[in-house]
Amino acid sequence: PMKFAYLIMAHNRFDILKLLLQDLDDARNDIFLHIDRKAEKYDEQELRMCIHSANLIILKPTPVYWGDYSQIQCILNLLKVSTQYAHHDFYHLLAGVEFPIKSQEYIYHFFEANQAYEFVGFNDDSKEYLERLKYFYFFRKYARYRNLWERFWGGIGYCLVPLQKFLGINRIKHCTTIFKKGYANWSISHPLACFLLQHEAEIRKRYRYTFCTDEVFIQTLVYQSDFYGKVYDPSDEYHSTMNLNTWEDPRNQYHMKDLPMLLKSDRLFAKKFDGDDAIELITKLKEQRL
């Protein structure tokens, strides 16, 4: 039988995270969970009590900052721990506020029928994202301006980008790599997971002090390799990852009104479920989904 590794990055909404863990509690699943070190207090025992059949491995918490290299490092850590733990047929990266809109049975059937593919999303809308790679983005971890100290360093980091533009700095000027971008979540095979880890030093060198490149580093490596020929749907980043995302809602959240659409969808995962009615929505979804 197939075996999955679910790699979960969480930082809030532990009520939703518990529902996610309960949903993934299947003997065929190994669940690798990283919780941001900056997260509010939570009860680890309560999380462990959600699991009876699967294996739950909670990684040592590190601070993860939005848009910062720490996001990439966290993904690599999850891949490292999960590939060393066991051989899995697929590694699924999920956020803590993401949820399967199909049952584990359905999801396993889908991947058994499609095990030749890599579920990585590509989007070629524009080359604007190259700005994220051209300059040094220092002090990204202070960009949320939580206090005076962060405001000071965050402000300096912010001012350094136009200065670099003025000075003509371009980190990728002589780089022959074709950079690609796409949806940040994916489902990948064991060989691709190992391939990414073999390139860890190169990833660090290239993407440290860049901005929001968790949507770039895997796509770029896959595009330059034979794995690109196995991508499920290179023309649609969400279909290729079997994910649903909402842009209609100002906070990109799903609500009760979206239930019929979620049930009708052929996708496997959706995000985000972190609105006021998220628990009610997930409960109804679980009752009625395939």
Regions found by a protein language model. Name each.
Residues 2-290:
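ER/Golgi luminal nucleotide-sugar-dependent glycosyltransferases, focusing on the catalytic module
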